């Protein structure tokens, strides 16, 4: 199978490069810029992509091994990656007079395999222009030998460069972001035409390979998996069960912070429909006791994570034959974990299920989804026969409703929130947008209700009420790195509000969150 290697110099959007490559049905992996040349050779990439990054090429701490340019494979340098390529191969990089951040238009020059025929506009003289996204201060001021300029802007005469003979290309802009309109085509052109990769990275092929790999790893030993009801653990369970059947036992911990009827749905789908062995643990009282009195969001996450591990450890200890612990770790988790280890990533919110496993568990780790992005996990779930509605549900945080209840978590609050959230989701599913023919659940990327621990005065019937408030949140995003609040129809919001206030005793006011990300995050905690 053909593979692309992406070396990460610390850009905030490096994952998007991998996404674009995978969209061409070509397998790729993302590794740190300082990956030893011996490991690069062992990986045997068909081509290499150098990411952008926040640093200057003059900082010696951020240099890849220059021998990568001697491997005889095409290389694409993006932003910092272009500057590193230019400097390493004998060109010059200097601090620019003008910094370029945001939208820019580049003018294509000469013919190149990378850009030929791609344009967003053409001027009267017949010159092609591309709309791109820039984010740089330094710039290339002298090309290395063998290179020619293939694009320019008024303030950046070398906006893109190429050495066609060696298959080396550099672009000062970011083709991986959606703001660069033809960026995906550029990356696909590099991967498929310049590098000559075959588009063989498909779900049927992946399933066959994964099943074979799991059987080779596990042999006749037993595996346990913590089933949360979320997409990742559910798909991991279905894949492992296809590979080894009854050698898999799932432990489903109901911490009392799940969505309405979620526990019942999980048991029906896995235990009854798929025939997976599932141990159902009712642990609501344990979690509520540990969370009592705690209001800090980060501490709540850690309490929920620690308690989940404790309960899971206790239950899995009863399965004395288990030698493997399976997890629904996906590729972004792996990338973020690696970034944290090298101090290149800042902790925004801690992941309750990454890292904190007991050291004395003595179990080998099985992570069959660790090479997949979220959209690929969903495709895999459908290919494995999981219900489409379940696989394409909106994201749900690991700590569940624990971080959608502001402040202290109580059973009373969770019960109210569960009902309100279910009504909101039902109204989204039942309301169809006439322009697109899709319902509003499909048109939003994530939607949920948030419980606010404040009371407001209301009037119901002839009496005064003093009850709780819930906020509704719905966003639209392509990558969850930025998001816009969803402009839902007033009629939909009105129905949802009316139903929540009338059907959920204890709530008398509903508000809608119109904050984008940034400055707000999608979740409230």
Curated annotation (Swiss-Prot):
Pathway: Purine metabolism; GMP biosynthesis; GMP from XMP (L-Gln route): step 1/1. It holds the Pfam family GMP_synt_C. The active site is at 79 (nucleophile), 174, 176. Its EC number is 6.3.5.2. Residues 201-393 form the GMPS ATP-PPase domain. Catalyzes the synthesis of GMP from XMP. NCBIfam families: guaA_Cterm, guaA_Nterm, PRK00074.1. This is GMP synthase [glutamine-hydrolyzing]. The gene is guaA.
């Amino acid at each position: 199978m053909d593979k692309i290697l992406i070396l990460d110099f610390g850009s905030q959007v490096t994952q998007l490069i991998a996404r674009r490559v995978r969209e061409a049905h070509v397998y790729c992996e993302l590794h740190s810029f300082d990956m030893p040349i011996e490991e690069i050779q062992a990986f045997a990439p068909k081509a290499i992509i150098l990411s952008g990054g926040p640093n200057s090429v003059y900082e010696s701490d951020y240099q890849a091994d220059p021998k990568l340019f001697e491997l005889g494979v095409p290389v694409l340098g993006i932003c910092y990656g272009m500057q590193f390529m230019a400097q390493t191969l004998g060109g010059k990089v200097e601090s620019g007079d003008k910094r370029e951040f945001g939208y820019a238009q580049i003018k294509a020059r000469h013919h190149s395999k990378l850009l030929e025929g791609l344009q967003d506009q053409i001027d009267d003289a017949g010159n092609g222009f591309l709309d791109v996204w820039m984010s740089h201060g330094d710039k290339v001021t002298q090309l290395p030998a063998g290179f020619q300029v293939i694009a320019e802007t008024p303030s950046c005469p070398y906006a893109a460069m190429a050495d066609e003979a060696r298959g080396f290309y550099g672009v000062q802009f970011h083709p991986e972001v959606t703001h660069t309109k033809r960026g995906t085509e550029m990356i696909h052109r590099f991967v498929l035409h310049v590098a000559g990769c075959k588009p063989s990275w498909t779900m049927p092929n992946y399933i066959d390979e994964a099943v074979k790999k799991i059987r080779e790893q596990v042999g006749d030993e037993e595996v346990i998996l913590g089933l949360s009801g979320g997409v990742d653990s559910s798909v991991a369970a279905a894949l492992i069960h296809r590979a080894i059947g009854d050698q898999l036992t799932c432990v489903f911990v109901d911490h009392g912070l799940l969505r309405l009827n979620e526990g019942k749905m999980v048991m029906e789908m896995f235990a009854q429909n798929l025939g997976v062995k599932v141990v159902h643990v009712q642990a609501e009282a344990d979690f509520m006791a540990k969370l009592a009195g705690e209001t800090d969001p980060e501490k709540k996450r850690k309490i929920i994570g620690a308690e989940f591990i404790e309960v899971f450890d206790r239950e899995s200890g009863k399965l004395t034959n288990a030698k493997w612990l399976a997890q629904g770790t996906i590729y972004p988790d792996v990338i973020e974990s690696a970034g944290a280890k090298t101090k290149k990533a800042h902790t925004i919110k801690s992941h309750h299920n990454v890292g904190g496993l007991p050291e004395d568990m003595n179990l080998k780790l099985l992570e069959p989804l660790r090479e997949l992005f979220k959209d690929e996990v969903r495709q895999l779930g459908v290919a494995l026969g999981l219900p489409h509605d379940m696989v394409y549900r909106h994201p749900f945080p690991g700590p569940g409703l624990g971080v959608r209840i502001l402040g202290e978590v109580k059973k009373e609050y969770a019960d109210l929130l569960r009902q309100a959230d279910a009504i909101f989701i039902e109204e989204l599913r039942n309301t169809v947008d006439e322009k697109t023919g899709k319902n509003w659940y499909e048109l939003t990327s994530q939607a949920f209700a948030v419980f606010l621990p404040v009371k407001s005065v209301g009037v119901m019937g002839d009496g005064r009420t003093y009850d709780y408030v819930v906020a509704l949140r719905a966003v639209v995003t392509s990558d969850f790195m930025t998001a816009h609040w969803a402009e839902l129809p007033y009629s939909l919001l009105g129905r949802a509000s009316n139903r929540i206030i009338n059907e959920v005793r204890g709530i008398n006011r509903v508000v809608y969150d119109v904050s984008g990300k940034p400055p707000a995050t999608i979740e409230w905690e």
